[in-house]
Amino acid sequence: MEHTLPPLXYAIDAL
């Protein structure tokens, strides 16, 4: 699945 919003993936990686 491709992430349309960069913050989504970023928030997950930040956690």
From Swiss-Prot:
Q: Which GO terms describe its biological process?
A: removal of superoxide radicals
The Enzyme Commission number assigned here is 1.15.1.1
This protein's name: Superoxide dismutase [Mn/Fe]
Record key words, sorted: Iron, Manganese, Metal-binding, Oxidoreductase
The UniProt record lists the keyword Nucleus:
no
User: Reaction(s) catalyzed by this protein?
Assistant: 2 superoxide + 2 H(+) = H2O2 + O2
Q: Which family does it belong to?
A: Belongs to the iron/manganese superoxide dismutase family.
**Subunit description:** Homodimer.
Q: State its cofactor.
A: Mn(2+); Fe(2+)
* Statement: the UniProt record of this protein carries the keyword Hydrolase: no
Q: What does this protein do?
A: Destroys superoxide anion radicals which are normally produced within the cells and which are toxic to biological systems.
Q: What does the entry's cofactor note say about binding and number?
A: Binds 1 Mn(2+) or Fe(2+) ion per subunit.
Superkingdom of origin: Bacteria
The molecular function terms of the Gene Ontology recorded here are:
manganese ion binding; superoxide dismutase activity
